[in-house]
Amino acid sequence: MSQQLQQIKEVLPSLIAKCGTSVVITIDGPAGSGKTTLAQELALELEGCYTIHMDDLYEGWGSTLTPKLAQKLREIFLEVKTENQISFTPFNWLENNLNPQIKLPASKYLILEGVGSGQSAIRDFASLALWIEVLPDIGLERVIKRDGPAVAQFMPAFLLLQGAHFEKEATKKRADYRLSGQGTV
């Protein structure tokens, strides 16, 4: 991924804001592909950057990649565009409830990373769309290693939903850059 990543880093300063004054970068791809790791690396390159994780926007396993989530994403980015502020209520997976609302001024760069971040509901707000690919068995192994064995029971259904979502949304095809997450992430 290093040569492609270098190309992406070189293009970052020339990106034009499409969401108010914020340059939105989406990082999508299958579970366990390395989206969060890439977001962290890019955030280090970008002064004035805030990252929203899709995991904070799902409200448990039953509300991933739903029309309700698409509406929530649209509302978040409309507020960034029109009111120059980031506002959302993150989900607490350990307690299975919502945490207090996060409300802060919009940043110069805003990264949205996670499964579903490149969907059509918010594509018009994004200045750069990235896709990271990974083989299903590698991605699943990483997810279980990262999140623990308790998530294994939810993954078969999530992986099916994720596949259907990606096919419907043509997320990979519409990405500006496609990266391989096969290596160590």
Predicted regions and their residues:
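Walker A (P-loop) phosphate-binding loop of P-loop NTPases
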Residues: G32
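Conserved nucleotide-sensing/catalytic segment adjacent to the nucleotide-binding pocket
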Residues: Y58-L110
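ATP-dependent NMP and nucleoside kinases share a basic, alpha-helical "lid"
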Residues: N99-R146
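Small-molecule kinase domains that catalyze NTP-dependent phosphoryl transfer to phosphate-bearing small molecules
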Residues: P149-V185
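Hydrophobic positions on the alpha1 helix immediately C-terminal to the Walker A/P-loop
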Residues: L38
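Short beta-strand-centered segment that lines the nucleotide-binding/catalytic pocket of NTP-utilizing
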Residues: G48-G62
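Extreme N-terminal, non-catalytic leader segments
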Residues: M1-V24
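Conserved lysine of the Walker
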Residues: K35
